[in-house]
Amino acid sequence: MTTPSYEYYGLMAEFWDLFRGDTSTWEDRFFYLANVEKFGQPVLDVGCGTGRILLDFMQQGIDIDGVDNSPDMLALCKQKAEKLNLTPNLYQQEMHKLSLPRKYQTILVPSSSFQLLLDPALPPVTMDRFYEHLLPGGTLVMPFMTLWKEGDPLEGEWTREATRREDGATIRRWQYSRFHPDTSLEDTIDRYEIIRDDKVIASEEHRQSPATRSYTQEQAVALYQNAGFKGIRVFHEFTFDPVKPEDRTYCVRGFRPE
């Protein structure tokens, strides 16, 4: 089987929601919602995936569109939307090639979606695309993660299991990661297994080398500055408190000038 050019496919996409569980109380949900309520609609959810934010906000009457580069994730989003009697505008595009029919008051890029841009030439291009898709005075809100700091181990691994509701099968996910300080890039290997009666009946491995780019707070702010954003602020995790120097998760917000 030829490996798709997008990261989320196959068992990884199928069991994405299962491993995330109930996300209704996640802090980022309330943070994004507060920004939308303050700065307005329409909204674009970049890297919308299976619709965690998109469908939630649509149910609240928010005018929001979604874009993702994975057809597998978008298909799952459509299935979930149909069950909720929702018809979202969904677009399959890569964010550095973003070309949508309308502009937005608020653009959200949840999770680590922006950090999946691995070619160093793509982040500034993508910031320009976001800028062009904002209405004058519109805002761009993105979280960032600093994946590694001096003294951290370079390698790590973990295993998680969940139960598939339909048949009681155990779904096991194992991940190995290695960080490269010289490039600020992380490699990952993810293995998904479906287990029934103590036997592995299906397995799929995803190798991404590299998989994710790490950003310091200074690098994230520079992206906004270089793209022409103004009123840039950096927040502690998913709060409106000022960022702390030691924060590994933080959100950046900036505005396209009027």
Where are these regions (language model features)?
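Class I SAM-dependent methyltransferase "Motif I" SAM/SAH-binding loop
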Residues: G47-G49
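A short glycine-rich, Lys/Arg-flanked "PGG" loop and its adjoining helix->strand segment in the class I
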Residues: P124-P136
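Class I SAM-dependent methyltransferase SAM/SAH-binding core
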Residues: R52-K97
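SAM-dependent methyltransferase
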Residues: P143-Q219
